[in-house]
From Swiss-Prot:
GN (gene name): Mrpl41
One MF annotation (Gene Ontology) recorded for this entry: structural constituent of ribosome
Cellular localization per UniProt: Mitochondrion
Originating species: Rattus norvegicus (Rat)
Subunit structure: Component of the mitochondrial ribosome large subunit (39S) which comprises a 16S rRNA and about 50 distinct proteins. Interacts with BCL2. Was also identified in the 28S mitochondrial ribosome.
Name recorded for this polypeptide: Large ribosomal subunit protein mL41
Keyword annotations of the record: Apoptosis, Cell cycle, Mitochondrion, Ribonucleoprotein, Ribosomal protein, Transit peptide
Annotated transit peptide: 1-13
Coiled coil region boundaries: none
Cell cycle recorded as keyword: yes
Length: 134
């Protein structure tokens, strides 16, 4: 009983629980690594590698590719403008409406052709009125 009491007191009173888990602290099966998965197993102090466990890197052919694989840390940050309803409309639906208007086939009563939904009935998430608890 004395051993268990000493161990629990050491843990409760602040034994170093945050220290690095090394082979001195861990079991015999512990192998120090950087998070990579093992590609085999040990048998009688010999490592047997399994071909199916070795990762394969699929790299596309980059011949003639002009960009370099390095970005300078002093490069200016990119500017991402937030996506608004107007911008989404102008990118997706507006070209089709303009095309139909120029051809003379635009019908204001048939907006379902462009993705317009007159009612939100039957939808799980309705856009209007807002369906969230207050």
């Amino acid at each position: 009983m004395g051993f268990l009491t000493a161990v629990t007191q050491g843990l409760v009173r602040g034994a170093d629980r945050m220290s690095k888990w090394t082979s001195k602290r861990g079991p015999r099966t512990f192998t120090k690594s950087r998070g990579a998965k093992k590609t085999g197993f040990y048998t009688n102090r010999k490592f047997v590698q399994i071909k199916e466990m070795v990762p394969e890197f699929v790299v596309p052919d980059l011949t003639g590719f002009k960009l370099k694989p390095y970005v300078n840390y002093r490069a200016p940050a990119g500017i991402d403008t937030p996506l608004t309803a107007k911008a989404l409309f102008l990118e997706t639906v507006a070209p089709a409406i303009e095309k139909d208007f120029k051809e003379g086939t635009f019908d204001a009563n048939n907006l379902e052709k462009y993705g317009f939904e007159p009612t939100q009935e039957g939808k799980l998430f309705q856009l209007y009125p807002k369906n969230f608890p207050r």
